[in-house]
Amino acid sequence: MPRRRVVGQRKILPDPKFKSELLAKFINVIMQDGKKSTAEKIIYKALDTASEKKGEDHLVILEAALDNVRPSVEVKSRRVGGSTYQVPCEVRPVRRNALAMRWLVEAARKRGEKSMALRLAGEMLDASENKGTAVKKREDVHRMAEANKAFAHYRW
């Protein structure tokens, strides 16, 4: 626990094209080595491709994809009397979004398409239809939490 004041969450500026804070956060997750303009190009191209294929609005596809990837529970390691238990815990809303975005990007990076924009578009389309690697990751995390439900009383 901090002895002084608790530091609040920083306000994030919405992205320039769609005026969405969620999209601005996603751009920051994609960004590598501080190259924000490159990350923006990748995201906007991916959203254009995805909305062209599905025929829906850009932000609707992104929101649907993130909804299907967001975890509601996860497991945390907790050491009790010499043995380590995987204790299921609820995930806070901010962390839910962060994990969903991170998993989407990781899954997209592992795909086989030519460019990152195409990989991301493919993964977002898959996730919006409740399939794909990112959704599988969420299901694995939920399965782990379900399997370790017996240790839920060790929560802190």
From Swiss-Prot:
Keywords: Ribonucleoprotein, Ribosomal protein, RNA-binding, rRNA-binding, tRNA-binding. GO terms for cellular component: small ribosomal subunit. NCBIfam families: rpsG_bact. This is Small ribosomal subunit protein uS7. Belongs to the universal ribosomal protein uS7 family. It comes from Shewanella pealeana (strain ATCC 700345 / ANG-SQ1). One of its GO terms (biological process) is translation. Part of the 30S ribosomal subunit. Contacts proteins S9 and S11. The gene is rpsG. One of its GO terms (molecular function) is rRNA binding. One of the primary rRNA binding proteins, it binds directly to 16S rRNA where it nucleates assembly of the head domain of the 30S subunit. Is located at the subunit interface close to the decoding center, probably blocks exit of the E-site tRNA. Pfam families: Ribosomal_S7.
